């Protein structure tokens, strides 16, 4: 069994992909692997049992890669994992910039409350 220690909130759906016959998540025992998002590991004292660090996200700025390499700890990240979120934000930005959507929302909020608004609109 390998013990995976998580930092930050890791999605339950993602954790379900681990074979529970081979991996234990956040057990009270020394970690074999570390899974994190934005948690800063630069001041972290790595136990000798750690074999790998995996970041759920792009980049490794929060992981002391050189220190890990010296200790034989492999570092992974997941570039492109947030690609869908980036696409959604780009499309939303295009819509918001192409039409006065935000201004229209504010205009609607400023309208006086009326009982027969459905008939008027």
Write out the residue ranges for each language-model feature.
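Phosphate-binding beta-alpha-beta segment of Rossmann-like dinucleotide-binding domains, i.e.
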Residues: 79-121
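An N-terminal-biased, well-structured beta-alpha scaffold segment characteristic
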Residues: 1-76
